[in-house]
Regions:
Chain A
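Gly-rich Lys/Arg/Thr-decorated short loops/hinges at beta-loop-alpha junctions or inter-strand turns
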Residues: 24, 30-37, 88-100, 203-209, ...
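Cofactor-/ligand-binding subdomain signature composed of acidic, glycine-rich
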Residues: 1-51
Length: 438, 182, 530
């Protein structure tokens, strides 16, 4: 459903079916809605068989990278004698994205169930759900749900009487966007600064506490129970006929200048134009859409011409020069200044850079300073070249992709809305103070 | 956290007084709090992993994380004070200085920015009497800061007051909202 | 990376057109070094865990989608690495520009100038100008305690210092504080860099951010003459470089040697140099006769000394910081004349560097106690015990306690071979001035039996001569023929006569030394036992 609004008939509610339904938050309520059947089933299955079902479903990571989930699980070497860990990435902090928050607020047991199944499938006895510290309500709901499930023996040292141990613990973050990066999250969970790690080693070889680890997004894990109950084939069918690479339903967070902001669950391949105008209600009265950042702030901005022909799946978004990312859709209307918004985004990344890599630490801040100077009316023609050259330096050269994410909207903004930037410069104020030349 | 006019505003090295008082430091991790921490330690294979939760306990108990508390937390978990400080300063939610009785965080990242979050910030600064970001009001009741994405973009503008998460705040709603936080 | 063993398979690759064969697991950066290619880098240091954060060592690896950080990328069979590919050079140019945007560019007043990797790589491949037009970040200078000062504006956050304190010193007093471009190297108020090995962070810092307070504004690096030497502060024998300006020692720095001190030198050692420049030296040979003490030329002084010693039992009080060569010639005198040689060992608290195996500031605060013992000298608190009427004494660069001085009054003759005049010494029949160890060449034997050369770093004052040269001459004057015109000849004489040194040659020692046969075996079993 387009929570907080009533569901649109064209939505396919799998994950969002019980959003707004307070009873679904309790263990009994969840069981009454068919919950924990999948876990019961899974605990009786061979881990490899669970992996096979998930592989077959075509489920891909919903955190942004879109890596096939079943394949990721299969990297875990079962029976290697080491403790394995599952991390659930609930550090949802990509601007524009707020879907995991609703999953945790309304269907905490869906996530616990998904975690427990995944833990069993990768040979882990412990799962940590890392929730960002600002999510006070989801933290509270998840803590209570875990406690309830633990008391009822659904999880714990003898999960559902299966003799298998599955502990699920909630871990509270403390304010750092970068902890949504998987290796930064592991460092943070270990009690360190949230610095991303160099890969290799990959988490499946040496992750949390140096042990084999799988890390999955909230939405990914919450999708696992219905897949197990209904089968991979069922999930796979929810896709474009001409694109089997993106399957299932996807929660889209929609925000910005739109009539009905909220979370919408649609099948992969849904037409973006219809989505924006029919489901989300189009632009505010008297306004027109101008640009969309469809996959969270880290993906390139697209124009409405591009948005109108986009299809809402991984490949469909790539086809119009952007990415599905975390499906956090930021819509901007014709009252917005693109340079101003790009500058604001750059500032976000400058604030959140972990400070490890030179290009990110210095580049995000420098980019922000240039953009803010341009917005303040003090830009020069050379700034275009400098920004593009900085973006080049910040792309593909650092440990993680935070600096790439800062560069993406800058480059796409400059390319697609260059006129707005140029207007800032032609109108620019005359220097009264000589520029400081380094 | 940077609140200056540019993304890099503010001197990184804090020379501000830390609210040191002449009273002797009272440890946080005693009695029930210590028992809670001990229980927590069983969830993790290392003591260090309990650092973030332990710092949360400190902040709950004291309202901020003082240097003395960093040293104590380090001692309890077998870490140096400098290490703990490095971690504390990485995460924006730990207060390195005392803040007002009600700590107001207004999201101003792009999705909220396009929906007018700046005006919400202004309304808070006006109605709390803080006047400036990061400054505690004269009566000690409020501190207002801008915060990066709170993850509730569809409910612009989300605001956190202490641990309460309030959605869809507009400048007009601010005076009424503040009445709940006297 | 775990250390390669004999069974580690070799990997073949091409770096800058050169064929390279290295053990699997080697980084591209280290592999390149083996064929003389230095890949620019800041955060990487062979003694520290890999951080991979400065992004300066980005190189082009053919068929790889992205540039690879050479420090954090292991070699692979058939890899073709182009360090100077256009896109790699552009990437590094970008890094250099960014490292300088907030840098104060204050090279004229920076101690690091001339030995600064930021300067070096910027000259080598950086931009000629900067495109940065915004205000620069500013943070005040901070005293980190110990001998270390932090200039955050020059800091590139490579974190070598933080990693050294964490992983090598096991005393995590430094951290990275804050994040983004507000980040800086921080410490906790009241917890200083007082670890006995903390001074190494100054050497590890590739730029002028961490400076030695002791060396502050003392000299420009290009005015310094550098000499390979060995620290004589304790029995560890850390390899070091003596830096002099106009014949004055101004700084001691570690010289890497993975058999002894890895890359490090302790604070005690590095600050223990002022005595090398002391002005109150014995500068001319003297002979004391009925008419009083007179300056003499070397021939007269040596024959007078021989005359004073001849036919007597000779006690030698020798400093445990004398070279093996000097001790050898002294042992000859003892052997020929009968008598004994002894020394007193100054001691202090031991201070290990836990991250490096078998490295510590040792309790024995002299360089060559082991050498002295091998040469038959006795370590004792009563070095003149047993001295009887009629015996002669040679005091060689050894300080005297009042008790020693009292014992000396029984001696029939006292010959002082020394750099300085011991305060308690009442009389010396002959005084022979010698060079201190940074004014001469020679070898020390460390506590594990590792024999290492040190070279001459400054000129000796007045008529002072190398200790081994003087003592060989004294042997000759006593009729014991010794040939020691050069340090190599002196060592050859030692190696021929002392069984422990058999088979060693001065040239063969090189600048990293050789271990006495059998000396480490005992140590190895000791380590296994503990």
């Amino acid at each position: 459903m387009g929570f907080p609004f009533t569901p649109h008939p064209r939505e396919t509610t799998v994950l969002s079916k019980h959003f707004g339904d307070a009873e679904a938050r309790t263990l009994d309520g969840w069981k009454a809605r068919g919950g924990y059947r999948a876990l019961e089933q899974a605990l009786g299955m061979d881990p490899l068989a669970i992996q096979a079902v998930v592989k077959d479903s075509g489920l891909r990571g919903r955190g942004g990278a879109g890596f096939p989930t079943g394949l990721k699980w299969s990297f875990m070497k079962l029976g290697d004698g080491k403790p394995h860990y599952l991390c659930c990435n609930a550090d949802e902090s990509e601007p524009g994205t707020f879907k995991d928050r609703e999953i945790m607020r309304w269907t905490p047991h869906a996530l616990i169930e998904g975690c427990a199944i995944a833990a069993h499938a990768i040979g882990a006895e412990t799962a940590y759900i890392y929730i960002r510290g600002e999510f006070t309500e989801p933290l509270d709901v998840m803590e209570r749900a875990c406690e309830e499930a633990r008391r009822a023996g659904v999880i714990g040292k003898n999960a559902m009487g299966s003799g298998k141990r599955v502990d699920v613990w909630v871990h509270k973050g403390a304010g750092a966007y970068i902890c949504g990066e998987e290796t930064a999250l592991m460092n943070s969970l270990e009690g360190k600064r949230g610095n991303p790690r160099i890969k290799p080693p990959f988490p499946a070889a040496a992750g949390l506490f140096g042990m084999p680890t799988t890390i999955n997004n909230v939405e990914t894990l919450a999708a696992v129970p219905p897949i197990l109950v209904n089968g991979g084939e069922w999930y796979k069918k929810m896709s474009r006929p001409d694109n089997p690479k993106s399957t299932g339903t996807k929660l889209w967070s929609v925000c910005g200048n739109v009539m009905r902001p909220g979370n919408y669950e649609v099948e992969m391949g849904f037409p973006f134009k219809e989505f924006l105008y029919d489901l989300c209600g189009g632009p505010p009265k008297g306004r027109k859409f101008k640009a969309v950042i469809p996959g969270g702030s880290s993906v390139p901005i697209i124009t409405m011409e591009e948005a109108d022909r986009a299809l809402m799946d991984y490949e469909g978004m790539v086809a119009v020069g952007t990415m599905l990312g975390s499906a956090g859709c930021i819509v901007m209307d014709d009252a917005q200044s693109i340079p101003r918004q790009v500058a604001r985004l750059a500032r976000f990344y400058a604030h959140e850079s972990c400070a490890q890599c030179t290009q990110c630490r210095e580049g995000t801040a420098w980019t922000t300073k240039i953009l803010e100077r341009m917005v303040a009316g003090d830009g020069t023609a050379e700034d275009f070249d400098t920004l593009m050259s900085l973006a080049e330096d910040m792309t593909g050269k650092t440990i993680c992709v935070l600096s790439d994410s800062c560069a993406a909207p800058v480059v796409s903004g400059l390319q697609k809305f260059r006129g707005e930037f140029e207007a800032l410069i032609t109108r620019r104020t005359v220097h009264t103070v000589p520029a400081i030349v380094a | 956290m940077s609140h200056g006019p540019s993304a890099t505003g503010g001197s990184a090295i804090s020379t501000a007084p830390n609210g040191h008082s002449s009273e002797p430091y009272v440890p946080v991790f005693t009695g029930e709090t210590k028992a809670r921490l001990d229980a927590l330690l069983e969830r993790y294979p290392t003591k260090m992993a309990a650092l973030l939760p332990a710092l949360w306990m400190v902040q709950e108990a004291r309202g901020w994380v003082s240097p003395e508390a960093m040293a104590e937390t380090g001692q309890v978990l077998g870490l140096t004070a400098a290490y703990v400080k490095g971690v504390v300063t990485f995460y924006t939610m730990y207060h390195q200085h005392p803040v007002g009785k009600h700590f107001v965080q207004v999201c101003t990242t792009t999705p909220c920015h396009v929906c007018g979050a700046e005006d919400v910030v202004k309304a808070f600064l006006k109605h709390t009497g803080c006047g400036e970001l990061g400054v505690t009001s004269a009566d000690g009741r409020y501190t207002v800061i801008e915060v990066e994405c709170l993850g509730a973009c569809g409910f612009a503008t989300p605001v956190m007051v202490n641990s309460d998460f309030i959605e869809s705040v507009t400048p007009e709603k601010v005076p009424e909202l503040l009445k709940q936080y006297g | 990376m775990t250390a390669p063993t004999a069974n580690t398979p070799m990997v073949n690759l091409t770096i800058e057109g050169r064929q390279v064969s290295v053990p699997a697991g080697t980084s591209i950066l280290e592999a390149a070094k083996t064929v003389g290619v230095l890949i620019p880098h800041y955060c990487y240091h062979p003694g520290l865990p890999v951080a991979g954060v400065c992004r300066m060592c980005l190189v082009d690896v053919e068929k790889a989608p992205k540039l690879a950080p050479a420090c954090a990328t292991s070699v692979a069979e058939g890899q073709v690495v182009n360090v100077h590919a256009e896109k790699a050079r552009e990437a590094r140019k970008g890094v250099l520009e960014m490292l300088l945007i907030n840098h104060p560019l204050d090279c004229p007043i920076c101690d690091q100038s001339g030995e600064c990797e930021l300067q070096d790589y910027t000259y080598q491949e950086g931009r000629a100008d900067s495109r940065y037009r915004e205000p620069k970040r500013f943070n005040p200078v901070e005293d980190f305690g110990g001998d270390v000062m932090y200039v955050p504006n020059r800091c590139i956050l490579c974190t070598r210092c933080v990693r050294f304190m964490d992983d090598i010193a096991h005393d995590a007093v430094l951290n990275v504080s804050e994040r983004g471009d507000r980040a800086y190297i921080g410490k906790f108020e009241g917890k200083d860099l007082t670890h006995p090995w903390a001074g190494n962070v100054v050497d590890l810092c590739p730029v002028g951010a961490l400076l030695s307070k002791d060396f502050l504004n003392k000299a420009r690096s290009w005015e310094l003459d550098r000499t390979a030497s060995v620290c004589n502060g304790c029995s560890q024998g850390c390899n070091m470089i003596v830096e002099t300006r106009d014949n004055v020692v101004v700084r001691l720095r570690p010289r890497p040697n993975n058999q002894v001190n890895d890359f490090y030198l302790c604070d005690y050692g590095r600050l223990n140099y002022r005595w090398m420049n002391r002005g109150d030296r014995i500068e001319a040979p003297t002979v004391t006769s009925a008419s009083g003490q007179r300056a003499a030329d070397w021939d007269v002084a040596l024959s007078s000394a021989a005359a004073a010693l001849k036919g007597k039992r000779v006690f030698v009080l020798a400093s445990p910081s004398l070279s093996n060569e000097a001790l050898h010639f002294l042992s000859r005198i003892v052997k020929v004349a009968g008598g004994k040689g002894a020394f007193r060992m100054p001691t202090g608290p031991e201070a290990p560097l836990p991250g490096v195996e078998d490295l510590a500031l040792r309790a024995d605060r002299a360089a060559n106690g082991r050498g002295a013992e091998l040469m038959g000298f006795e370590r004792t608190d009563q070095p003149l015990a047993g001295l009887s009427q009629g015996d002669a004494v040679i005091v060689v660069d050894h300080d005297l306690t009042p008790d020693d001085a009292a014992s000396l009054s029984h001696a029939s003759a006292v010959v002082l071979v020394s750099t300085f005049m011991p305060a308690a010494l009442a009389r010396a029949d002959v005084m022979l001035p010698i060079a201190n160890y940074v004014e001469e060449e020679g070898t020390f034997t460390n506590l594990r039996g590792h024999v290492q050369r040190f070279l001459q770093a400054r000129a000796a004052p007045g008529m002072a001569r190398p200790s081994w040269y003087v003592l060989a001459d004294l042997c000759n004057a006593l009729g014991d023929r010794q040939d020691a015109m050069t340090a190599a000849q002196a060592f050859a004489a030692l190696a021929a006569a002392q069984p422990a040194f058999a088979g060693m040659s001065y040239d063969g020692l090189g600048l990293r030394g050789k271990t006495i046969a059998g000396a480490t075996a005992g140590q190895a079993s000791l380590e296994v036992a503990t």
